[in-house]
Amino acid sequence: MAAPRNVFKDRLRSQQIGLFATLNSPALAELLAGTGFDWILIDTEHSPGEMGDVVAQLHALQGHEISVIVRPAWSDMVLIKRLLDAGAQSLLIPNVQTAQEAASAVSYARYPPAGVRGVSGGSRASQYGQSADYLRTADEQICILVQIETPLAVSNLEAIAAVPGVDGLFIGPNDLAASMGYLGDAQHPAVQAAVVEGFARMRGAKQAPILTQGRIKFAAFKLRRTARFGDLNGLLPVLDNMAHSQPR
């Protein structure tokens, strides 16, 4: 049995639109799989989701065309190993500020000698040992995206982008705004200017500019600047807007 290809990684330089899922609901994840989005991100950084919640959502999404990204709570060797063994192929690593931190994240996702990922002979990722080529092909199918969320990370952007195994950069305006002194104001002109500058520098570094999370207005602003991986909104705001739009 052949190991699955990472379709999201194959299409990384085409514009893909998706949603952040923070409610830990397999039913909602399965519902979203049929709505035409390119990807769904299962979040464990800003949600109470644990490993069992992630696996349940991966099960619900299996067999659907939608791609799945998982965000670990932190760039941690054990967390990353467990998510990859559970079957995640694309990870969004939060709060990466230096090239060394990016290199560490990549190493956690790769088997020796390229990295330090522990080897399981019967993980869900290898279809419980039935994928004979999983260990041989896993490293090339793993997609590592890193979040640029602070002025320090922005200043190190080119060095982070140059780390082998970093497949894309995420500019997160909410944390960037907070770290710039504009907590809760990702629309501030200084924050938007920093995002535009970051996108330009990504292109200079030959990295595909990637998503930013936030309101639709800000996402559209970003996508017009050739983002390749766009998050038009999170699932929670979508549901909130739907609920508030219903007649009373």
What is the meaning of each model-derived region?
Residues L19, L32, D43, L91, ...:
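Conserved, mostly hydrophobic/aromatic
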Residues M1-F20, S131-E140, E197, R203-G204, ...:
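N-terminal amphipathic alpha-helix/helix-capping segment at the start of soluble metabolic enzymes
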Residues M51-D85, S107-A114, R136-E140, Q187-I210:
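Alpha-helix-loop-beta-strand connector modules within alpha/beta enzyme cores
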Residues L28-A56, P173-P189:
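Glycine-rich, proline-tolerant flexible connector loops at the mouths of alpha/beta enzymes
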Residues R117-Q130, I142, I148-S155, A186, ...:
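C-terminal alpha-helical cap/extension of soluble enzyme domains
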Residues S90-S104, L169-M180, K217-N241:
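Glycine-rich phosphate-binding active-site loops on the catalytic face of alpha/beta enzymes
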